[in-house]
A protein has these predicted regions:
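PLP-dependent class I/II
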Residues: 2-252
């Protein structure tokens, strides 16, 4: 356990990396990942998603050539945001297995941040990294929490999950203070949320489903030049404002 997913990621990185090691992200991605990488003094390798321009399907595709090139360069860790924040993109089983195969070939640890998984909309399938068998277990650590799905971030409890003996042995070297700082109330709330919180979560997802389609309709009618792909997961909206011609510094 840890106080939150950010602390969990940082502490896992401290166990498995040294300052100066390389770590992979795929942008656009949650801003705090960059803060965690700076905190652990790692070198960022960014392999951005590529946009297909096809709005009828998932417009964000993985740059596999870029991913393998990064892995082959001596990469230590790949942080996978699954489901992806802020794109609302789901990874397929085939994509995850391909990442696992690369991680085994190049001896890379995959940290799978699955905090947004409970907020998956009906008709989409979330695939946990650790559900994919022994190979996935041997190359990955999962971090997650009930904080996004059940809105209990303030209760300060996250989960670090491994199903591999060698990885568990290394995680056991983590300072015990990391676990002790997690909230006892948060631990109980997390257990109850995951085991008994389905009715409440279903109602939240229903509201979010309405909101994501309402936003699409509003943009189509009021700001048709703004591109928005309806996400498959969570409450985030990633809007492409390029055609508004706001300039290089829109906040200025």
């Amino acid at each position: 356990a840890a106080t939150d997913v950010g602390v969990a990621v940082v502490e896992v990185l401290r166990v498995f990396t040294n300052p100066g090691d390389s770590i992979l992200l795929s942008s656009p991605v949650y801003q705090n990942f960059y803060n965690w990488i700076n905190e652990t003094k790692l070198n960022l390798v960014d392999v951005p998603f590529e946009r297909t321009g096809n709005e009828s399907a998932n417009p964000w595709v993985i740059n596999w050539d870029g991913i393998e090139k990064a892995y082959a360069s001596g990469l230590k860790v790949h942080i996978l945001c699954s489901p992806h924040n802020p794109l609302g993109r789901m990874y397929t089983k085939e994509e995850l297995l391909r990442i696992v195969a690369l991680a085994k070939r190049y001896d890379v640890l995959v940290i799978s941040d699955e905090i947004h998984a409970p907020l998956t909309f009906k008709g989409n399938t979330f695939v946990p990294m650790l559900s994919l068998g022994n190979d996935a277990e041997s190359v990955s650590v999962t971090v997650t929490a009930a904080s996004k799905g059940w809105n209990i971030a303030g209760l300060k409890c996250a989960i670090i999950v491994s199903q591999n003996e060698a990885i568990n042995s290394r995680l056991a070297t983590m300072p015990m203070a990391v676990h002790y700082r997690a909230s006892l109330l948060g631990a109980f709330a997390t257990a109850i949320a995951f085991s008994e919180g389905e009715i409440w979560l279903d109602s939240v997802i229903e509201n979010l489903d309405h909101n994501r389609h309402m936003l699409k309709d509003l943009l189509n009618s009021q700001l048709p030049s703004v591109r928005y792909h309806i996400p498959d997961n969570s409450y985030l909206a990633w809007l492409d404002l390029e055609k508004l011609n706001l300039g290089a510094d829109p906040a200025a």
